[in-house]
Amino acid sequence: MSSFDYIKTAIRQKGCTLQQVADASGMTKGYLSQLLNAKIKSPSAQKLEALHRFLGLEFPRMQKNIGVVFGKFYPLHTGHIYLIQRACSQVDELHIIMGYDETRDRQLFEDSAMSQQPTVPDRLRWLLQTFKYQKNIRIHAFNEEGMEPYPHGWDVWSNGIKAFMEEKGIAPNWIYTSEESDAPQFREHLGIETVLIDPKRTFMNISGAQIRENPFRYWDYIPTEVKPFFVRTV
C-alpha cells in the first residue's frame, strides 16, 4: 500500500472524479494522479494542504499505530476478548476483521453440538455489543467464500484481504494473534509485523472449537453478550 491510500479512499467516499478533486485542490489531474501513486518525491505542502482540506482530512496527518485482529468469532469467547483488549491497549486504532464463508460456517455448525447456527449478523452483533464503549475499535465483515482454508489457502486469502483493507483504507502496522503458526504466515504474505498474545493459552485456555463441541461445559468462557444465543436453544 502506498502512503496516500487513505486519500484514494477519501476520494472514493466523497464520490468525486480525479478532475474535480484536482480542480478543487489547485493542481492538475496529472499531478494528482502521480501524487496518489507515490511518483512525486517531494510534493508541494500547499497542494497537499488544499487536497486534505477539500477531502475533510487532517493535515498534517498524524502517524497512527494501527492494529488488526482476524478471526471467525464462531462464537466469540473470552480468549478473543483478551486478545482484542490487549491489542487495543497497544494501538491508536484497532480493526477487527471477521471472516465468514457460508459453506465452511455451515460445516462448522453441523460438526458442532450447537442447536442453532450463528449467523453473520449474530457474530457482528456480539462484537459490536462487547466493544461498544471502545471508540478506537472498528469492526468489519470479510467474505472468505471460495478461499481454501489455510494452510493451503494463504496466497488467495492474503490477496483478498489486501484488497479488502485497501478498499476500507486500513493500513495496519501490526497484526495481533494468539496462533503461533499464523504469525510467520502473516509476515510472509502480508509483510506486516505480527504480535503474539498468549499463544500458550496461559491466561485464557479456551478455543472456539471447544465451545462448539460443548457450550455448557465451557459456559464461563462465553461472554455475557453471547450467552443469550445459547440460552434460547435450551
Regions found by a protein language model. Give the residues of each.
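Recognition helix of helix-turn-helix/homeodomain-like DNA-binding domains
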Residues: 26-42
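Helix-turn-helix/winged-helix DNA-binding modules
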Residues: 13, 40-43, 203
